[in-house]
Design a protein with these regions (language model features):
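Nucleic acid-machinery interaction/catalytic patches
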Residues: 5-386
Length: 389
């Protein structure tokens, strides 16, 4: 069978690919070279799904029982190296709320703060992952004279553009919105610093904080026992953040790292194609020890069929027929090479109901809003009953 995909009125994408995949060929290469010594390696992947498929391919290739190598995600790699525990997101939200209230002297309720607090946690995470100087980033810009001078240079069109996002923006005068913005911005670094300090004292951290903690120690040549006597193989990465680059670079210097990049598609090797942005940099800086055999089946042979269907309900019903036609019933692992991609999360439940009955194992890798679940509907009905009784 060739590679192929069906596109149903631009809503659903069903892809099927052959078994001779990138991960399969890497598993085969390492088995050929090491066989009984595979457990000496730690294979690191961008996500858990890739690691699970790599482990599956290893089990198919091996002819005899052997000790499995360690297969982890990049987040798990940082976590195990740090000896810290990953803090619970809800606990982090309460912690940063209390810190914010203490530093800002605010009486803001948790309900009001929660939405902004989640964004703050996400920003702190990105700051650390990208190894940004937080003190410089969260610069105190409370000197209103400088702000007013900055705002006054805007043209009328620029002011109108800003007002689309900040409706109270008025460069000619001070207002409560601007004062609140300045007051909030001025305390972000103290909040960030105190938040990390409290987490560290409890042996906790969030992903970005843990990654930065590990890479800081590596750059300072401090010993991290977990890395000792390990050989790491990084597989399938693309857009590396600064923490990941530091980790790979430092392990490479110690001859403890090997790298494999999935850049076989012609588009990824075309310098004029934006998709090739990371190709040259990654393959030049992080080279592979073994040459991986190219995919036997060219991606140029991919068959694409467009199916025009006017409604979402009709699309889900068509998927039932497509999946039924792809594989015979009771064929073991027949759907492991098939992906159904939906851009609209509201169609997830109708899609699940449309899956043929003989498919009893499905891996759903997208989120689904609680408000659309049957439980949420039940709770809404109970609330309505209580209010109207």
């Amino acid at each position: 069978k060739d590679n192929f995909c069906y596109i149903c009125s631009s809503h659903f994408l069903i892809c099927h690919f052959l078994m001779n995949s990138f991960l399969y060929r890497i598993a085969s290469t390492f088995y050929q070279h090491h066989q009984d010594k595979l457990n000496a390696f730690t294979f690191v992947f961008p996500n858990r799904r890739a690691g699970l498929f790599f482990q599956k391919y290893l089990s198919e290739i091996t002819k005899k029982p052997l000790f499995s190598p360690e297969i982890i995600t990049i987040e798990s790699c940082f976590l195990q190296a740090s000896n810290l525990e990953l803090a619970d997101k809800l606990s982090n939200l309460f912690k940063i709320y209390n810190i914010y209230k203490t530093i800002s002297k605010s009486n803001e309720s948790f309900d009001t703060f929660a939405f902004w607090g989640e964004m703050l946690l996400a920003d702190f995470n990105e700051v650390d992952k990208h190894r940004v100087d937080a003190r410089q980033l969260f610069t105190n810009i409370s000197e209103l004279k400088e702000i007013d001078t900055f705002f006054e240079v805007f043209t009328e069109n620029q002011v109108l553009a800003i007002q689309q996002f900040w409706k109270d923006f008025e460069p000619s005068r001070r207002n409560a919105s601007r004062d609140q913005f300045v007051a909030t911005w001025s305390i972000l670094f103290p909040v960030y610093e105190q938040f990390k300090k409290e987490l560290l004292s409890e042996g906790l951290g969030y992903e970005g904080m843990i990654a930065k903690w590990v890479t800081d120690k590596l750059l300072n040549n401090e010993d991290i026992p977990w890395f000792n006597d390990k050989q790491f193989v990084f597989i399938g990465f693309n857009a590396l953040n600064p923490c990941e680059k530091v980790l790979m670079t430092e392990l490479q210097k110690k001859e403890q790292a090997d790298f494999y990049w999935d850049y076989e598609a012609p588009e990824l090797r075309d310098n004029n194609n934006p998709a090739s942005l990371f190709f040259k940099e990654n393959t030049r800086q992080f080279k592979s020890k073994y040459e991986i055999k190219p995919q036997a089946e060219s991606l140029d042979n991919t068959q694409i069929e467009l199916i025009e269907i006017p409604s979402s309900v009709g699309q889900t019903k068509e998927i039932y027929h497509i999946l039924n036609a792809l594989y015979p019933k009771n064929e073991e692992n027949s759907f492991l090479n098939t992906a159904v991609v939906i851009p609209d999360e509201n169609l997830l439940l109708p899609l699940l109901y449309a899956v043929p009955e003989h498919i009893n194992k499905i891996n759903v890798t997208m989120g689904y809003p609680m408000q659309f679940t049957p439980v949420a509907g039940l709770m809404e009905d109970r609330k309505s009953t209580r209010l109207n009784s």
